[in-house]
Amino acid sequence: MSTIYRTEEGGRAVRQRYDALLDRWPVPHEPRTLSTQLGDTFAVVSGPVDAPPVVALQGSGGTAAHWLPDIATLAGSLRVYAVDAPGEPGRTVEARPPLGSAAYAEWLDDVLDALELPRAAFLGTSLGGWWALDHALRRPERVAALALVNPAGIGRRRVAPLLKFAGYRLFGGWGRRRSLAMVANGSPAGPEQREVGEFTLATFEHFKPRLEAVPEFPVERLHELVMPVQAHFGARDVLLDQRDAAAKLRQALPDADVRLAEDAGHFLPGWAAAVAEFLGGRS
C-alpha cells in the first residue's frame, strides 16, 4: 500500500503522466534504477559521458521530469544525473526517514557508489537544495561544488502562505491552481514550464507531501562549506524568505556566488546557463 499517495489509483495516474513527460525528454538520455540501502532509486542520465558529473535533486512534489525546461542547457556541458528522491513522486522508494537524520546523506552515498562516482557536483532546488546542503556538510569530500536554486533550509519559512494553501485545498482543482499561481508569483512560463506546471497540479491531486518542518542551517554551519558555491534566490518567493537566505549565505561564505533576483518567486527562471557555466569546470 502506498504511503505517499491518497490512493493506489492516484499513484498510478501520477506515474503514467511522469512517464509521458520523460518520453518527451529533449536530449539523449538513459533511465537507471540504482540499488541503495533505502531501496531502489530512479535516475535519468543525460549529457556527455566525459563531462563533469552533477547530481540534480528536485524539491517536494518534484521528480526528474521537473528538470525538463532546463535539461538541454545543463546537459550540453554536464553529465547530469537527475535523481528522484525517496518519499517523493516518481519511481524511487517511498521511504521518508526524518530530515534531521543522517539517512539522506547515506542514501546519496549509495547513489554515488551505484553510479561509480567518488565525488560529484550537486544541484538542488527547494527541498532538493536542502538535501544537497546536508550532503555537502556531512560528506564534503564527495561534493565537488554546490549549485542551489531557491534552496530550503537557509531563509526563514513563511507561515501565512501555508495557511492559505491549507484553505485552498478545500476547493479542489481551483484551489490547487490558485496555490500554484501563488508559488509561481508571476514567473514567466514557456511551453515546457506550463507542461511541468500541469504535471505538478495533477501530482498534488493525489500526492501527500511531507508535513515535517525542514531543519534550518545556521550561519555557523554554512560557514563550514568548503566547496565552491553558487546560489540563486528569488526575492518574491512566497514559501521562503530568500532575501534573508541570500544575506545569510553571503555572511557565511563571502566568496560564494550569490544572486538575488528581485522580480522572481519560488519558480526561478533563467538560472540554468549560469549554473552550467559554474559547474562546467568542476568534477
Residue map of PLM features:
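Conserved alpha/beta-hydrolase "nucleophile elbow" surrounding the catalytic nucleophile
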Residues: 58-60, 120, 124-129
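Flexible "cap/lid" loop of the alpha/beta hydrolase fold
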Residues: 130-138, 143-173
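Conserved alpha/beta-hydrolase catalytic His-Asp/Glu region
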Residues: 157-159, 171-227
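Catalytic active-site module of serine/aspartate enzymes centered on a nucleophile-bearing elbow/loop
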Residues: 255-283
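Alpha/beta-hydrolase fold catalytic core
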Residues: 1-53, 77-78, 118, 279-283
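Conserved serine/cysteine hydrolase catalytic core
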Residues: 209-251, 260
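Active-site loop/oxyanion-hole signature of alpha/beta-hydrolase fold enzymes
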Residues: 81-123
